[in-house]
């Protein structure tokens, strides 16, 4: 049997099916674009799901893929086993061949058998097949093609061998191919009591989609039968490299060896599992970041954070004191970057996110581990860590629950999940204690009822600013009403069609007026419910408005034009950011208002002044070029093929609007836009800031608002010139002179304060209290800077060998604690411990420092009256 590399296995699989007239379809993002039921793509069929359900079509009827997949959240969560078992991974590659109404069972089995035995040269006597127990057709084909007897075809009665998407929809029996690693390895055939062993390993699964489930009791034959198959690349490579553990294949071993050379610890014994965790999690983290996921405390971002922090904890176990994962990234890019170019494109961004997250977590990891050690000292095998402690680790130290469980795994200590969930619920209740209910659930049902009765609202605003529309519903205080009579009453109005744009896609809703007969209504906002009901938020200004009557709907044209300007500028900005900052930039959020735009992007560091200038120049150049802005309706798949930018996780219909601005920008967008880029006028960035780890926010103004900004800045400059009694040419010089003078004054003040706090040896001897053979000197001072107190305390402890110096500075509603200990006595008295205990006594949360010098804070000023007693008790224990 020939030995293949991982790359060769992948390549041979794809080449084989291409030679058999399958279209090679590139891997989709790990983020499912059109499937809200999934957090991550977890198999090869996900990108074809709409084809299998009949909701979509492709220009081919046979496909082959190598699909990057991830299982670390929700139903498919393998995280706790990763690194400890032979075949569990968070990130893995799924090889698959697919037929959409072309070939079926016989050809699928033939393709699989031929590839395994002829191309990969697997011994035929090592292979077995499972089938669904009623699928005699598949059994017959296995006998015909592979020559299997009944002893090699295993009938399975459970749903493990019958696949379905849900309670209804396409479904069908499965046939799995198993490889026998040999009797030297424990395990039995599928269906036996020893089936969970590692001897017989599933290497290929074929799903024969031949039925449609109508309800729980009824299914019918599909007229168009399909094939969905999956072969785990890592598993297959292990078989072809004659190893029984996926982590022993070439790809993982190269990462592990590379890590070993950095960490300088052998990948043996318990350390072996940590190396495997790191290798697996490096792949998962890097590919998630490349696909636009950023570590956060919710959703996909939290799954990424859990994976990264689990890896960091294992790096810590190996003795790594510095960030490690970002140092391993170049090796991963070298191994997989040619197959997945997104890794190469986003390498610098991935590296910075990995390093930042490791630095951030390192600050709390050791403290959290210390707390966990203290809390489990008295626990023995089979005991449980309290939910309260687990929640404190999660809430205060950033330990995901599964990380705490992973740490305790080897000690056979569990975590009280119920107690943890109770603590989580308590926190959520506290967070919502000011929320008293608003009839929201009732209102949600109301929208569903309206949609069921009247359908979606037709939007006319792409071509019309004014239209005659029929009022189909009025809502006041969460209730449907027939009319509105009270002047200045706020209410919601729904019509069959409207020129008003409902807030969506970052663009806020239109304002304007609605008039009918003798009535007049002011529209103060326009919203969108259930994705397709446009709702006008109104105030009655005159007369009476009724359900069923026709009314004249008119948007505020100037307001809409300013929205158009800022929305089109957002598209141009997005394209320019790709060019200036890199292809890793993805949209994380946006707001298009009539007076400004806000755009949040994935980028790990501050945008420099030089980059901001370059971005502004390029955006304004595109505006001046006055490109035509065109809008086209096309199939989503065609739009993305043409290079249209789509947002990760955004759900798009089968037909989408594609907005094109010259050759600069091509995006899927349902918003309103200018006719030519020149209509924007001009563009100016007003601010750039961080809003989360790896996410930057850019705000900008366009058109007339740039002129307004310039006038405001000019007015401010004149006011500053007047205050400093100078002109703009000399302003910087004057300000710098003042700053220099301030520095000198601050230095003089610092010297004066230090001198006032200084004491001679004789004064120290006289003022200090004698406690257990050492001197304690406590001083309460005013709101003096910590830096000065630190220096003063250090100066005094250098003069006397047995002194503990404590300063407590009282500010507005807060206390600052400084503790210094002479180095000669730090073996007995630790400034860090004293400062932390004083902080807790004074209502703080602890501090930090070294044995000879530490600082902390507090806020319970009333307890200062008992500070002497507390100090004495701390030092006499």
UniProtKB/Swiss-Prot annotation:
GO cellular component: a single term: cytosol
Entry-linked Pfam families: DHHA1, tRNA-synt_2c, tRNA_SAD
GO molecular function: alanine-tRNA ligase activity; aminoacyl-tRNA deacylase activity; ATP binding; tRNA binding; zinc ion binding
Binding site for Zn(2+): 567, 571, 669, 673
Catalytic activity: tRNA(Ala) + L-alanine + ATP = L-alanyl-tRNA(Ala) + AMP + diphosphate
Note on how the cofactor is bound: Binds 1 zinc ion per subunit.
Record's subcellular location: Cytoplasm
Record remark: domains: Consists of three domains; the N-terminal catalytic domain, the editing domain and the C-terminal C-Ala domain. The editing domain removes incorrectly charged amino acids, while the C-Ala domain, along with tRNA(Ala), serves as a bridge to cooperatively bring together the editing and aminoacylation centers thus stimulating deacylation of misacylated tRNAs.
The family this protein is said to belong to: Belongs to the class-II aminoacyl-tRNA synthetase family.
PANTHER family noted in UniProt: ALANINE--TRNA LIGASE, CYTOPLASMIC (PTHR11777:SF9), ALANYL-TRNA SYNTHETASE (PTHR11777)
Name of this protein: Alanine--tRNA ligase
Organism, scientific name: Rickettsia rickettsii (strain Sheila Smith)
């Amino acid at each position: 049997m020939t030995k293949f590399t991982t790359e060769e296995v992948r390549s041979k699989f794809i080449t084989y099916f291409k030679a058999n007239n399958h279209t090679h379809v590139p891997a989709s993002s790990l983020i499912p674009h059109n499937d809200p039921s999934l957090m991550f793509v977890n198999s090869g069929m996900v990108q074809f799901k709409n084809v299998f359900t009949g909701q979509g079509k492709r220009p081919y009827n046979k496909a082959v893929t190598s699909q990057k997949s991830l299982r670390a959240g929700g139903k498919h969560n393998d995280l706790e086993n990763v690194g400890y078992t032979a075949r569990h991974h968070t990130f893995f590659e799924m090889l698959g061949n697919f037929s959409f109404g072309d070939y079926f069972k016989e050809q699928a089995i033939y393709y699989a058998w031929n590839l395994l035995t002829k191309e990969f040269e697997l011994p035929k006597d090592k292979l077995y097949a499972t089938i669904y127990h009623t699928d005699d057709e598949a059994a017959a084909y296995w006998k015909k093609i592979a020559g299997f007897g009944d002893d090699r075809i295993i009938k399975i009665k459970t749903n493990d061998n019958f696949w379905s998407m849900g309670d209804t929809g396409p479904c069908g029996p499965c046939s799995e191919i198993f490889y026998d690693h040999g009797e030297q390895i424990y395990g039995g055939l599928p269906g036996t009591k020893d089936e969970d062993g590692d001897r017989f390993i599933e290497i290929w699964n074929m799903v024969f989609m031949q039925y449609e489930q109508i309800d729980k009791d009824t299914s019918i034959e599909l007229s168009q039968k399909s094939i969905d198959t999956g072969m785990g690349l890592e598993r297959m490579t292990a078989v072809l490299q004659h190893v029984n553990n996926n982590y022993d294949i070439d790809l993982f071993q190269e990462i592990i060896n590379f890590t070993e050379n950095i960490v300088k610890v052998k990948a043996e014994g318990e350390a072996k599992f940590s190396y495997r965790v790191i290798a697996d999690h490096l792949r998962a983290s890097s590919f998630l970041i490349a696909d636009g996921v950023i570590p956060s405390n919710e959703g996909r971002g939290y799954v990424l954070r859990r994976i990264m922090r689990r890896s960091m904890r294992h790096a810590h176990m190996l003795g790594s004191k510095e960030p490690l994962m970002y140092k391993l990234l170049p090796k991963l890019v070298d191994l997989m970057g040619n197959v997945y170019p997104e890794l190469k494109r986003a390498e610098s961004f991935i590296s910075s996110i990995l390093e930042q997250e490791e630095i951030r977590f390192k600050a709390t990891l050791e403290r959290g581990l210390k707390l966990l050690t203290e809390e489990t000292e008295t626990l023995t095998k089979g005991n449980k860590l309290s939910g309260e402690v687990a929640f404190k680790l999660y809430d205060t130290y950033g330990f995901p629950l599964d990380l705490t469980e992973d740490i305790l795994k080897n000690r056979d200590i569990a975590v009280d999940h119920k107690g943890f969930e109770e603590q989580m619920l308590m926190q959520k209740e506290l967070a919502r204690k000011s929320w008293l209910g608003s009839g929201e659930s009732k209102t949600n049902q109301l929208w569903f009822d309206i949609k069921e009765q009247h359908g979606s609202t037709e939007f006319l605003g792409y071509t019309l600013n004014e239209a005659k529309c029929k009022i189909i519903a009025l809502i006041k205080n969460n209730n449907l009403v027939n009319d509105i009579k009270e002047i200045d009453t706020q209410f919601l109005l729904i019509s069959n069609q409207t020129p008003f744009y409902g807030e969506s896609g970052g663009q806020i809703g239109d304002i304007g007026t609605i008039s009918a007969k003798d009535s007049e209504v002011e529209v103060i906002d326009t919203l969108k419910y259930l994705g397709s009901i446009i709702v006008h938020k109104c105030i009655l200004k005159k007369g009476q408005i009724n359900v069923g009557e026709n009314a004249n709907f008119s948007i505020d044209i100037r307001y809409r034009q300013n929205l158009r300007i800022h929305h089109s500028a957002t598209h141009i900005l997005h394209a320019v950011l790709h060019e200036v900052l890199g292809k890793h930039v993805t949209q994380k959020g946006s707001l298009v208002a009539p007076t400004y735009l806000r755009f949040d992007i994935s980028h790990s560091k501050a945008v420099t002044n030089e980059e901001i200038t370059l971005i502004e120049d390029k955006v304004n150049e595109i505006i001046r070029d006055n490109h035509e802005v065109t809008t086209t309706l096309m199939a989503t798949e065609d739009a993305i093929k043409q290079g249209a930018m789509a947002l990760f996780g955004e759900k798009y219909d089968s037909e989408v609007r594609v907005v094109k601005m010259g050759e600069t920008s091509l995006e899927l967008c349902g918003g309103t836009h200018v006719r030519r880029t020149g209509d924007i006028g001009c563009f100016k960035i007003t601010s750039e800031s961080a809003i989360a780890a790896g996410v930057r926010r850019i705000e900008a103004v366009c058109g007339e608002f740039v002129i307004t900004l310039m006038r405001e800045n000019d007015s401010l400059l004149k006011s500053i010139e007047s205050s400093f009694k100078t002109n703009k040419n000399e302003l910087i010089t004057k300000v710098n002179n003042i700053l220099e003078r301030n520095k000198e004054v601050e230095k003089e003040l610092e010297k004066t304060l230090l001198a006032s706090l200084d004491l001679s040896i004789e004064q120290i001897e006289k003022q200090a209290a004698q406690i257990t053979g050492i001197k304690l000197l406590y001083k309460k001072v005013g709101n003096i800077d910590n830096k000065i107190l630190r220096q003063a305390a250090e100066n005094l402890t250098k003069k006397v060998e047995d002194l503990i110096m404590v300063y407590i500075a009282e500010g507005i509603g807060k206390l600052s604690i400084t503790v210094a200990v002479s180095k000669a006595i730090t073996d007995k008295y630790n400034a860090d411990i004293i400062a932390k205990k004083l902080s807790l006594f004074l209502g703080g949360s602890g501090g930090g420092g070294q044995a000879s010098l530490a600082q902390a804070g507090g806020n319970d000023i009333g307890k200062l009256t008992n500070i002497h007693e507390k100090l004495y008790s701390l030092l006499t224990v």
